[in-house]
Amino acid sequence: MSDGNTAAAWVPTGSVTVRVPGKVNLYLAVGDRREDGYHELTTIFQAVSLLDEVTVRNADVLSLDIVGEGADKLPTDERNLAWQAAELMADHVGRAPDVSIMIDKSIPVAGGMAGGSADAAAVLVAMNSLWELNVPRRDLRMLAARLGSDVPFALHGGTALGTGRGEELATVLSRNTFHWVLAFADGELLTRKVFAELDRLRRAGDPPRLPGPGPVLAALAAGDADQLAPLLGNEMQAAAVSLNPGLRRTLRAGVQAGALAGIVSGSGPTCAFLCPSAAAAVDVGTEVSGVGVCRTVRVASGPVAGARVVPAPTEV
C-alpha cells in the first residue's frame, strides 16, 4: 500500500516524449554591459528543424542519459540544464524529481544553437504532461527564464523578437519557409568570452552597430528570402571571428557555394547560410561540406514549433 506521499500515488505510469528545436539568430544587437554583468540584447530568433527528442518516465530517482551526436561531451548530472529543469519543475509543484530523462540529440553540441536550453524546455513540457500538472504556459515561461536566457524561446518556437537578456519574447510574423545551411566550425566559443572580446573591441574602436530590427521584421512578414538576406546581422560576429579566424573562411565558402547570405549565429561557432530554396540548401550544404572548413554541416528549415509533446502511437 502506498502512504500517499510517493510519486506512484499521484502520477500515471508510462512516458512522454517531446520534440524541441534548435535556434538561429537572424539579428542580434548587443547593448553595453549592464551593472549586473549582462548585456541588453535585441535579437530575432528562428526555430529550425534540427530537433532533439527528450523522453521522460516515472522512476525511483532522478537520472539522465544522453545518446546521439556529441552525447559523450555532455554531463549527465546536476551540471546539465535538463537535470536542473527536472528539479525546478518538481520543486515548483512540491514533489520529488523522480523521473528518468533520455535525450536523443540531433542539435549539435556546443554549436551555438541552444541545444542545452532546448532540452531543459523539453523536460518542463514533458513533466507537465507526464504528471498531468496543467501548469499554465505563463508559469512554464517563468520557470524557463529562471533556467537560462535561451530556454523561453525553446518553449515558444516559431520566430520571435527577444529583448532583455533575450528571455523577453514577442511573436514575430514570419510568412513562408526559410531554408538554411548550418555549418558548425571546429572548436567551442564560450559565450562569456565572446562578450568579453566584444567589450574589448568596442573599447578599442567601436565596431559598427546594427540599425534597428524593423527592416528584418518587414522581410520576415513578407516571407522574402532575397529581402531578408542583406539584413541578417550580428554585432557579436566581429568578436567571434576575432577569437576564431577560421569562421571567416566558413562564411566565404557558404556564399561562394550559392547562399544568399551568411552570418555567425549568436556567439558562434555556427555559421547560418540563408538559401533561396530547399534544393539550393542541399547543394550549398554539399559544397560547404566538401571544402573542409567546418566539422559538421546540416540543412534545416524554419520556422518550426517550439517544444511539443509527440502524440503516442494509436493502437490499431
UniProtKB/Swiss-Prot annotation:
Protein name stated in the entry: 4-diphosphocytidyl-2-C-methyl-D-erythritol kinase
EC identifiers of the protein: 2.7.1.148
Biological processes, Gene Ontology terms: isopentenyl diphosphate biosynthetic process, methylerythritol 4-phosphate pathway; terpenoid biosynthetic process
Pfam families in the record: GHMP_kinases_C, GHMP_kinases_N
Pathways per UniProt: Isoprenoid biosynthesis; isopentenyl diphosphate biosynthesis via DXP pathway; isopentenyl diphosphate from 1-deoxy-D-xylulose 5-phosphate: step 3/6
Active-site positions on this chain: K23, D150
Binding residues for ATP: P108, V109, A110, G111, G112, M113, A114, G115, G116, S117, A118
Classification of source organism: Bacteria, Bacillati, Actinomycetota, Actinomycetes, Mycobacteriales
Function comment: Catalyzes the phosphorylation of the position 2 hydroxy group of 4-diphosphocytidyl-2C-methyl-D-erythritol.
Entry keyword annotation includes ATP-binding: yes
NCBIfam families reported for this sequence: ispE (TIGR00154), PRK03188.1 (NF002870)
Keyword Nucleotide-binding assigned: yes
Catalysed reaction equations from the record: 4-CDP-2-C-methyl-D-erythritol + ATP = 4-CDP-2-C-methyl-D-erythritol 2-phosphate + ADP + H(+)
GO function term, MF aspect, one: ATP binding
InterPro entries named in the record: GHMP_kinase_C_dom (IPR013750), GHMP_kinase_C_sf (IPR036554), GHMP_kinase_N_dom (IPR006204), IspE (IPR004424), Ribosomal_Su5_D2-typ_SF (IPR020568), Ribsml_uS5_D2-typ_fold_subgr (IPR014721)
Gene: ispE
Family the entry assigns: Belongs to the GHMP kinase family. IspE subfamily.
Keywords assigned: ATP-binding, Isoprene biosynthesis, Kinase, Nucleotide-binding, Transferase
